[in-house]
Design a protein with these regions (language model features):
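S-adenosyl-L-methionine
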Residues: 1-19
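Conserved class I S-adenosyl-L-methionine
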Residues: 18-29
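Conserved SAM-binding loop of SAM-dependent methyltransferases across substrates and taxa
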Residues: 29-41
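A short acidic, Gly/Pro-enriched loop at the edge of an enzyme's catalytic core
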Residues: 70-78
Length: 140
């Protein structure tokens, strides 16, 4: 279980240090990354298809990535997901394109979607599948 906390901390620290407006898709019950991002003042909200058992201090909206409510993601610089099911990647990419946000995914093991996007190493390997067209959102 310690490995999962390491992953969450790496993802949370990366997002918090590179973005000011983030949305986590598919939070489930693992809120470590979202807490780090929230503590940095950069978390807009978390979403999941089911109401998860997370702390009441995290902003949460129930939403289905296969039919997203775009208003929940408005203003986000980055959409991120930790260990999403591979079938969630195409609608995540579409959402990121629609709202002009980066999309960053941490996959389980060595999974990836198509070519895997741009690889970002923050202590764990992240896949950036979409890059915002807004130059102020660029992560180098």
């Amino acid at each position: 279980m310690g490995d999962y906390k390491h992953i969450e901390k790496c993802v949370g620290n990366f997002i918090a240090s590179h973005y000011t407006r983030a949305v986590e898709v598919g939070i489930g019950r693992n809120e470590e990354a979202a807490q780090i991002i929230s503590n940095a003042g950069a978390l807009l909200r978390c979403t999941d298809v089911k109401a998860p058992g997370i702390s009441g201090n995290l902003p949460f909206s129930q939403d289905d990535i296969f039919s997203p409510d775009l208003s929940l993601y408005a203003g986000a610089e980055v959409i991120y997901a930790i260990r999403p099911a591979i079938e969630m990647i195409p609608p995540l990419i579409e959402l990121a394109e629609q709202i002009n946000a980066d999309l960053i995914v941490y996959h389980l093991g060595f999974e990836s979607y198509e070519q895997g996007g741009e690889i970002l190493d923050c202590g764990v390997l992240l896949h950036r599948y979409h890059v915002s067209q807004n130059p102020s959102n660029r992560v180098d």
